Amino acid sequence: MEKITIRLEEKDGAARINEPVGLGIPLPKGTVQAIYQLALMNGQEPITVQLQPLAHWPDGSLRWVHASFLVSLDSGQVKDLELVKQQEPNATTSHEPAIEQTSDRCVIRTSTGSVALASNSLHWQVTQKNNPGTPSTVTLTDEAGLPCTAEADASWKITHTGPGFVAATLKGQWLKQNNEPLSRFECELRIFLETGLIQVELTTHNPKRARHRAACGILATQAPCTFGNWR
């Protein structure tokens, strides 16, 4: 397989430090049978990347893959990365992150500390090495400006694991102050293992209206991520 060039360009005039990038990449028919055969390179240096098969050719080879990774760019910088097929891929290499599950929480270890997800709750806590934990949550207010309560259906579910990130999802419903259901929600946390960055995506669904999706990225040292009013 020929190298596939991925060109990244910073156009907003701001330096980017370890920002998440996700994109789909098409592959030629019959060239790649499994994702472990692929590597993402920055010159001669490999980049930690999490690859997920999206589609296959009729012969079973990969047709599309989704790549997730972190990248740093200076203001106005253009950077070319290359997706290559490894000559000697190692199918047995393990990239399983350290995850500890207890009755009251799920803890994901990162290179900078840990992220603890509270069971049956839309709360999590980020702890960095030699620093106290930072509690985080998502809040919602109703049309009167009153805070709603997040009632989870069950505990957080780990949906993706790999060398780049761990993803966890929590589903439930928002309740008004009188316990009347307001809307459904689904929250996904994408925890990047190299930096402790957490990417938050929240979808709310009011059966009487359309779905609404919001997302933000927070560092381990930043304040909790909060979303605005439901109208």
Regions found by a protein language model. Name each.
Residues Q128-T134, P224-R231:
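P-loop NTPase switch/coupling surface
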